[in-house]
Amino acid sequence: MNAQLDGLSVSSSSTGSLGSAAAAAGGGGGAGLRLLSANVRQLHQALTALLSEPEREQFTHCLNAYHARRNVFDLVRTLRVLLDSPVKRRLLPMLRLVIPRSDQLLFDQYTAEGLYLPATTPYRQPAWAAPDGAGPGEVRLVSLRRAKAHEGLGFSIRGGSEHGVGIYVSLVEPGSLAEKEGLRVGDQILRVNDKSLARVTHAEAVKALKGSKKLVLSVYSAGRIPGGYVTNHIYTWVDPQGRSTSPPSSLPQPHGSTLRQREDDRRSTLHLLQSGDEKKVNLVLGDGRSLGLTIRGGAEYGLGIYITGVDPGSEAESSGLKVGDQILEVNGRSFLNILHDEAVKLLKSSRHLILTVKDVGRLPHARTTVDQTKWIASSRIGESVANSAGFPGDHTEEGTSKPGFYKGPAGSQVTLSSLGNQTRALLDDQARHLLTEQERATMMYYLAQYRGGTISVEAMVMALFELLNTHAKFSLLSEVRSIISPQDLDRFDHLVLRREIESMKARQPPGPGVGDTYSMVSYSDTGSSTGSHGTSTTVSSARERLLWLIDLMENTLDLEGTGETTQGSTNALPDVSVDDVKSPSEDLPGIKPPPPPPPLAQGHDRLLGQPRKPGREDPAPLSSAAHSGIVFSAPRNRSPPPGTAPTPGPSSAQDSPSSPIYASISHANPSSRKPLDTHLALVNQHPIGPFPRVQSPPHLKSPPAETPGAGACLPPPSPSEHPDAVGANQHFVLVEVHRPDSEPDVNEVRALPQTRTASTLSQLSDSGQTLSEDSGVDAGETEASTSGRGRQTASAKNKNGKEQPRTERTAEGANKPPGLLEPTSTLVRVRKSAATLGIAIEGGANTRQPLPRIVTIQRGGSAHNCGQLKVGHVILEVNGQTLRGKEHKEAARIIAEAFKTKERDYIDFLVTEFNVML
């Protein structure tokens, strides 16, 4: 191919666009003013030879998106759709040469997962090539004609370009027209009435199949259908200075969230103990001596235990332990396959420690979830359906362990065996990010009432509509759908779809003279067609879902009358019957289910106020979530601390790992700790009217002196009193979009990390999910160790300062039903105590959330250290500047500039917990 490419000529017009885009991917700017490198020229020639003009434009857009966000994972996922043949995939090695060297390792890891290896099976090749009739004698024609307008065709389909696969026949009803004409399960539909189904979404395929009485299908006998997904976790690794590096040698890539092996097998498998690799360290901790370790990892993450921080002057430093060492054994107990909490307990249990460590010289930094499609042979589908018993007239359960569910004809839901616990855990995980404790308890109450048969699906949905009253909260319905009974699924989909259509109509402009309020929602890029579909995420992205709804509104009959259903977002490819079966629309009942018991309200607002014990922090979520409303890339789960009031129904807090990937281990006597209140905010609350005023009263900016004694936080001392506050005014702020497949009105405001030292690993925001903050393993709080552990002492600083605050608000909220709090505004002063602010916001003017709302608080950032900001807060003002009328980007810029300015070492946020749209 190189010889072929060398002889190609490059037009000047296309060279400018593609060449500059490729140069941009390599980090260059102003490519038109300098000569292109040989690698860029070779890539451009290959693009000209292998891709059409529209494909080259998509490729250019893909590179521009990567250059703007530096998200390697999304770059590779997007290329999966574009480079749809082995010949086109030859562009990947050329592209690798023009991306920054620091991203090449991650690029290699993602492509090594098998996503873009040349197809080796007879099934993969026709997925995109067969639409042109390239199948070796396997393509055949199937003609279907409806006798009546509403007669069903008798088959269901699965797949779509948003899942990276073609359109496949997943079910054929016995005795149906499709069966009589020879359509079989496992057939791939290539064309419908001369319309190609290559690279079409699932919704587009459904519309093409339902748009005509007579169908001539070109099908390919693939003999299989796409099933669920296998989730692989890829870790990025850094050296002790925080620079990206390659993984340790002989470290296998995990093919799941855990690696459960016997310790002796794991030892031999990882080849960790080679000659001269390990050393023994004998530690005897005297009185007042600090162990001073920060550890990371655990068996629940498929990792060993690594040292990520060593305090200056500690016993660990004196014994030669350093950042980048892996702990293999402690007092005879292997650390190769030990849970994180067990490692913490063992390191705290004795003052005489004999450690076996290995100098690995690198650390796991961030984990990204990569999903691989699992295929189900059509023969297995037939056997499992024949051997299963189901409801009369409905299709039955499929005998496979693939996680997730898919939808059968006439609204029947084919539930897979491992769905129940997993979907409940996913729902609970997403609810922690979007809802307060009271709201989460309210939702679980209604779900429990529905599952127990106390209320109908209509009553439950109407109650959830009242509770999930913002766009982000509404996205939880995609997870709620997974626990709906099969017989209620059609009704649930119809109600949700009608609500979404009503919401969109309400937001439409009154006339053509008004700007398009959907411009940022309907903005389409290549990355939007590859929604996240891991085992702990949902399939469709917000943009895809809204575009589909808009398309249905413009091109189909009145959906409110026909009762057509939406495709739920699941972690397996959904089936949709292509039959035009009309479901009569039923009037919604006017009854409302009773509210949940009020005692749950006493647990409200204790999430941030509850003192935490070192070593018992929350685990990092397995992956970021993609919803119909918004995509979150939260670094940590927010589960209630011990002592929080239980929620009704079975709690899934124990379903996920309860141990963090980092821990703080301390031998310190609690009575000897000094109160550390450096990062506590100064809070002053006052009631406001039904709609909060954005203008802040002048006295809020200068709180009275007696405020600290009234139960609020003490004012932070001057930076000179605490060594860890030195240099707090040196910040560089970056505002970036979370993920290219998320809604464009979600920005993360954070600062670039400052200079890193060898003793502590700084947290970087990578293309994958950033793991949680490091915490310390120490034997005593000393001033010397405090100066070397800025992030490690964050939990200790909040321990004593959070015993008292928020009790008045907790008692006040106990008298109100969950989710119905009286609006109050709060002034929160956030000290610039870290290199990052660490919050992500959604909303802004001209959106469903008119004022910015906090959706993520990153651990280790200034907002987290403050302890008073929390997820769900609506930001009214920043340093006295109102955010009313500010669009999302403008609001994000205001927050970023407030953090960047050197005029003050804090930011004043006026926030509210008001639960309705302002």
Curated annotation (Swiss-Prot):
Q: Where in the cell is it found?
A: Cytoplasm; Cell projection, Stereocilium; Cell projection, Growth cone; Photoreceptor inner segment
Q: Where is the composition biased (Polar residues)?
A: 563-572, 654-672, 754-773, 783-798
The answer to whether UniProt assigns keyword Phosphoprotein to this entry is: yes
Mind listing the UniProt keywords for this protein, alphabetically?
A: Cell projection, Cytoplasm, Deafness, Hearing, Phosphoprotein, Repeat, Synapse
Keyword Phosphoprotein listed = yes
What is the annotated tissue distribution of the protein whose record heads this document? Expressed in the retina. Colocalizes with RPGR in the photoreceptor connecting cilium, a thin bridge linking the cell body and the light-sensing outer segment (at protein level). Detected in the inner ear throughout development from embryonic day 12 to 20 days after birth. Displays a dynamic pattern of expression after birth, demonstrating an ordered appearance and fade-out across stereocilia rows. Isoforms 5, 6, 7 and 8 are not detected in the retina.
Q: Where is the PDZ domain?
A: 141-224, 280-362, 827-910
Query: What are the protein's GO molecular function terms?
Result: identical protein binding
Compositional bias per record (Basic and acidic residues), positions renumbered to this chain: 800-811
Q: Which residues carry this modification: Phosphoserine?
A: 696
Enumerate composition-biased segments (Low complexity).
522-538
GO cellular component, alphabetical, reads: actin filament; ciliary basal body; cilium; cytosol; growth cone; neuron projection; periciliary membrane compartment; photoreceptor connecting cilium
- Major localization listed first in the record, in broad terms: cytoplasm
Biased composition of type Pro residues is found at 591-600, 638-649
What is the documented disruption phenotype for this protein? Mutant mice for isoform 1 appear viable and comparable to their wild-type littermates in growth characteristics, reproductive performance and general health. At 2 and 9 months of age, knockouts show a profound hearing loss across all cochlear frequencies. At 28 to 33 months, they show signs for retinal degeneration such as a thinner photoreceptor nuclear layer and outer segments shortened.
Q: Its domain of life?
A: Eukaryota
Q: Where is this region: Disordered?
A: 240-266, 387-407, 503-538, 560-824
GO BP annotations listed: auditory receptor cell stereocilium organization; cerebellar Purkinje cell layer formation; detection of mechanical stimulus involved in sensory perception of sound; establishment of localization in cell; establishment of protein localization; inner ear receptor cell differentiation; inner ear receptor cell stereocilium organization; paranodal junction maintenance
PANTHER family per the record? Answer: PDZ DOMAIN CONTAINING WHIRLIN AND HARMONIN-RELATED (PTHR23116), WHIRLIN (PTHR23116:SF37)
What's this chain's function?
A: Involved in hearing and vision as member of the USH2 complex. Necessary for elongation and maintenance of inner and outer hair cell stereocilia in the organ of Corti in the inner ear. Involved in the maintenance of the hair bundle ankle region, which connects stereocilia in cochlear hair cells of the inner ear. In retina photoreceptors, required for the maintenance of periciliary membrane complex that seems to play a role in regulating intracellular protein transport.
How does the record describe its quaternary structure?
Answer: Forms homooligomers. Interacts (via C-terminal PDZ domain) with MYO15A; this interaction is necessary for localization of WHRN to stereocilia tips. Interacts (via C-terminal PDZ domain) with MPP1/p55. Interacts with LRRC4C/NGL1. Interacts with MYO7A. Interacts with RPGR. Interacts with EPS8. Interacts with CASK. Interacts with CIB2. Component of USH2 complex, composed of ADGRV1, PDZD7, USH2A and WHRN. Interacts (via PDZ domains) with PDZD7; the interaction is direct. Interacts (via N-terminal PDZ domain) with USH2A (via cytoplasmic region). Interacts with ADGRV1/MASS1 (via cytoplasmic region).
Disease affiliated with this protein: Defects in Whrn are the cause of the phenotype whirler (wi). Mutants are characterized by deafness due to malformation of the cochlear inner and outer hair cells and by circling behavior. Stereocilia are shorter and wider than in wild-type animals and there is a decrease in the number of actin filaments in inner and outer hair cells. The number of outer hair cell stereocilia is reduced with increased spacing between them.
Protein name, per record: Whirlin
The organism encoding this protein is Mus musculus (Mouse)
